[in-house]
């Protein structure tokens, strides 16, 4: 009997239109970063550059900081279902590279955790600098568009934070 080896990955089934939209968004992010002379934090590897990764449609590497990066792989033709030839799926992996001479490790994460990590790194989310800019009347370029990422931390609106800074802490 022939031995069959299988690799099991956590994946989320998506449509081909979502994959195309994802590729477009990544390309726009890369073009925007290039136009603003920022370091490349997002890298797109098409299927022909993802060596030895069968069924990989594309691989996107998102660098969170020096030690952590997210790898988003989109797969195609995973399982031929009845009457369906093209099946697309996405997996998200967090790779942690600790200080030198230690082995890197990786884990698969959910889209919610990936959203939270990306949001906390790429948006200043009403930190002290954003509050001070708003008080001075300067334009706050990075606007928090993902308030669900702060529900656990209890971050309030930017206007409330500005009022708290101007009038001091609430006295009881």
UniProtKB/Swiss-Prot annotation:
The keyword Ubl conjugation applies. Induction: Expressed late during infection in a Rev-dependent manner. GO terms for cellular component: host cell cytoplasm; host cell plasma membrane; membrane; virion component. InterPro entries: Vif. The modification Phosphoserine is found at residue 157. One of its GO terms (biological process) is viral life cycle. It is found in: Host cytoplasm; Host cell membrane; Virion. It is a peripheral membrane protein. Pfam families: Vif. The modification Phosphothreonine is found at residue 107. A motif (HCCH motif) lies at residues 119-150. Keywords: Host cell membrane, Host cytoplasm, Host membrane, Host-virus interaction, Membrane, Phosphoprotein, Ubl conjugation, Ubl conjugation pathway, Virion. A motif (BC-box-like motif) lies at residues 157-166. It comes from the Viruses. Its main location: host cell. Processed in virion by the viral protease. Homomultimer; in vitro and presumably in vivo. Interacts with viral Pr55Gag precursor and host APOBEC3G. The interaction between Vif and APOBEC3G is species-specific, which may play a role in restricting the replication of SIV to their host. Forms an E3 ligase complex by interacting with host CUL5 and elongin BC complex (ELOB and ELOC). Belongs to the primate lentivirus group Vif protein family. The BC-like-box motif mediates the interaction with elongin BC complex. The HCCH motif (H-x(5)-C-x(18)-C-x(5)-H) mediates the interaction with CUL5. Counteracts the innate antiviral activity of APOBEC3G. Forms a complex with host APOBEC3G thus preventing the entry of this lethally hypermutating enzyme into progeny virions. Functions as an adapter molecule, recruiting APOBEC3G to the ubiquitin-proteasome machinery. Targets APOBEC3G for degradation through the assembly with elongin BC complex, CUL5 and RBX1. Binds viral RNA and affects the stability of viral nucleoprotein core. May play a role in viral morphology. Vif-defective viruses show catastrophic failure in reverse transcription due to APOBEC-induced mutations that initiate a DNA base repair pathway and compromise the structural integrity of the ssDNA. In the absence of Vif, the virion is morphologically abnormal. This is an African mandrill isolate. This is Virion infectivity factor. It comes from Simian immunodeficiency virus (isolate GB1) (SIV-mnd).
């Amino acid at each position: 009997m022939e031995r069959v080896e299988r690799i099991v990955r956590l994946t989320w089934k998506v449509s081909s239109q979502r994959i195309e939209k994802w590729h477009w968004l990544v390309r726009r992010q890369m073009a925007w970063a290039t136009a603003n002379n920022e370091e490349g934090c997002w890298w797109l590897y098409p299927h022909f550059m993802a060596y030895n990764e069968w069924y990989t449609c594309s691989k996107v590497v998102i660098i969170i900081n020096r030690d952590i990066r997210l790898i988003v792989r989109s797969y195609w033709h995973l399982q031929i279902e009845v009457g369906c030839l093209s099946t697309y799926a996405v997996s998200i992996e967090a790779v942690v590279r600790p200080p030198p001479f230690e082995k890197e490790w990786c884990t698969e994460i959910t889209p919610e955790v990936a959203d939270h990590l990306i949001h906390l790194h790429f948006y200043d989310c009403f930190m002290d600098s954003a509050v001070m800019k708003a008080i001075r009347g300067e334009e706050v370029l990075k606007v928090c568009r993902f308030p669900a990422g702060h529900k656990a931390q209890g971050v309030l609106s930017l206007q409330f934070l500005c009022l708290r800074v101007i009038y001091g802490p609430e006295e009881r």
